[in-house]
């Protein structure tokens, strides 16, 4: 990080998969509400304050929601102790001091619906179809982060508040600060500001799993707007062990090396025998729920059959 700056993160181990049926999309809605009023920064006061300090929304100030987590992100000057104090106040407000005002909910409802419409195109449909195949009928497939537009249109502030009060619990949160900082000052401030959060009983959640495929299946998606022709082969495998020992680390290095070697081999073959554009094979853990072996090839028009045959022969 640049001198005089620090990166701040609030990690919340809660996302769309925790939503009830009538909450589909509210984890993401709540993320939006985090920038629309809190205990110390009413309405748009937080954004105005940060922008007055030179922060740019999207670059220095951002957040994302996924199936299993919501992450809030700041990158701000750290040389001024008062600014550091204010930044950690913002993180603490996100953790337990959001207003979720009814008027702000109505305003943000339109923003989220517009965001949903703007992302609805051929590429998005293709990506969603691929993801649904990967999720294989698990709970994840019923809890896409963007949610259900009917829920977004009709939810009340109380519905969002219910999700917030249930899942934004200290036991499901972590704070990280990295950069040009005084670590002792940061520790003291974190204890001071986050020590005031609710100590209610922690919510319980059973990890979701993605079942293995019961049989081989083929799904074909066509759309004239798509500019590429891709073949993806998915195999669900046991989840690899977390890296905790030298043996685990060795296994991780072997997997990484094999992924890279195969990619180099396939790209070299494509250069010498251009029947496809590029290809890759990669093993990774997915949502901490399953291991995935993904083989992908981008095919060339007019050479699809040859490209597929050569790709499979190389594996």
Predicted segments, located by residue:
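An aromatic/glycine/proline-enriched structural segment found at the starts
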Residues: 137, 174-232, 237
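A structural supersecondary motif
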Residues: 56-60, 234, 259-298
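Mature N-terminal segment immediately following signal peptide/propeptide cleavage
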Residues: 1-11
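Histidine-acidic residue clusters that define the catalytic metal-binding segment
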Residues: 72, 129-173, 183, 205-209, ...
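Extended catalytic-interface subdomain
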Residues: 74, 95, 227-235, 241-260
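Short acidic/His-enriched helical or mixed secondary-structure segments at domain edges of catalytic enzymes
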Residues: 111-130, 209-229, 268-277
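Short, solvent-exposed loop/turn segments at the edges of secondary structure
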Residues: 3-5, 54, 65-69, 107, ...
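Active-site-adjacent, His/Asp/Glu-enriched structural segments that form or flank metal-binding
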Residues: 12-27, 32-125, 154-155, 159-172, ...
């Amino acid at each position: 990080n640049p001198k005089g700056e620090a990166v701040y993160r609030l990690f919340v181990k809660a996302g769309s998969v925790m939503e009830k049926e009538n909450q589909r999309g509210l984890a993401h809605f709540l993320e939006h509400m985090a920038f629309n009023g809190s205990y110390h920064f009413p309405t748009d006061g937080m954004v105005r304050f940060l922008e007055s300090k030179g922060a740019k929304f999207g670059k220095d100030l951002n957040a994302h929601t996924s199936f299993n987590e919501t992450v809030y992100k700041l990158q701000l000057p750290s040389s001024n102790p008062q600014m550091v104090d204010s930044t950690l106040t913002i993180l603490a407000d996100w953790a337990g001091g959001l207003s979720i005002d009814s008027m702000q909910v109505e305003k943000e409802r339109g923003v989220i619906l517009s965001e949903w419409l703007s992302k609805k195109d051929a590429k998005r449909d293709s990506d969603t179809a691929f993801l649904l195949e990967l999720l294989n009928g698990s709970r994840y497939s019923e809890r896409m982060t963007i949610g259900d537009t009917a829920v977004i249109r009709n939810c009340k502030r109380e519905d969002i508040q219910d999700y917030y009060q249930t899942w934004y619990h200290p036991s499901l949160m972590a704070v990280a600060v990295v950069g040009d900082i005084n670590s002792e000052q940061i520790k003291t401030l974190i204890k001071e500001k986050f020590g005031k959060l609710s100590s209610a009983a922690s919510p319980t959640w059973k990890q979701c799993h993605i079942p293995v495929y019961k049989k081989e299946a083929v799904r074909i998606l066509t759309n004239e707007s798509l500019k590429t022709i891709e073949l993806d082969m998915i195999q669900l495998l046991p989840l690899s062990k977390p890296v905790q020992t030298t043996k685990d680390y060795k296994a991780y290095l072997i997997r990484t090396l094999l992924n890279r070697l195969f990619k180099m081999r396939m790209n070299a073959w494509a250069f010498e025998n251009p029947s496809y554009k590029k290809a890759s094979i990669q093993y990774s853990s997915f949502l901490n729920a399953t291991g995935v072996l993904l083989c992908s090839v981008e095919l060339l028009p007019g050479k699809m059959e040859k490209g597929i045959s050569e790709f499979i022969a190389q594996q």
